Amino acid sequence: MPRSSFSPLPSNLPDGAERRALQLLVVDDDATQRSLITVAAKQAGHEVTVAPSVAEAIEKLRTARFDCVTLDLVLEDGDGIDVLGEMAKAKFGGAVIVISGMDGKRRSAARSFARSVGIELQSLPKPLDLAALRISLANLGKTAMGLPAMHTWGGVATDAIVERHRA
């Protein structure tokens, strides 16, 4: 059986600091995308809950606490913007990573809406760049502990990867 080519990112944690698993909600109606995101997050040591629809996402957000939500913009029963609206009403304080096949203009509109309701988000296009997702999750874990985001992938700073996918 071939070995996985995935190796965890170095922690860059100060001595004595412990990594904390993020509570992640994956909202995507595409089973393959949900699986990819779930596997990457679990490999990084995070706890994952999935919601394949707007209705399930809203229900899970009402009944559990999440550090981060990955969110597709187009779902069978509605729009990811609807989920962002519900998150704003609930004063969601976690991170949001939009992962969508929609064009940059639509992802930018989602980011603008999110900012207008007090939510900051990152945006990654489909097909998903797993390295960028892993970096984003690693940095979220660090910032949740009050540490600066420091991870890079292949010598490229995280901010450069995320900025490349903005707009």
Task: Enumerate the predicted regions with their spans.
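Two-component/phosphorelay signaling modules centered on CheY-like receiver
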Residues: L13-G16, A31-T49
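Non-catalytic signal-transmission and effector/linker regions of two-component phosphorelay proteins
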Residues: M1-L25, T38, A131-A167
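Short hydrophobic/Thr-rich beta-strand motif most characteristic of the beta2 strand and flanking loop
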Residues: G45-P52, K60, L124
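Acidic catalytic/metal-coordinating carboxylates
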Residues: S53, D79-D82
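Active-site residues of response regulator receiver
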Residues: D72
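Conserved acidic carboxylate
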Residues: D28
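Alpha4 helix (beta4-alpha4-beta5 surface) of REC/receiver domains from two-component response regulators
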Residues: D82, E86, M102-S123, I135
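The feature encodes the CheY-like receiver
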Residues: E76
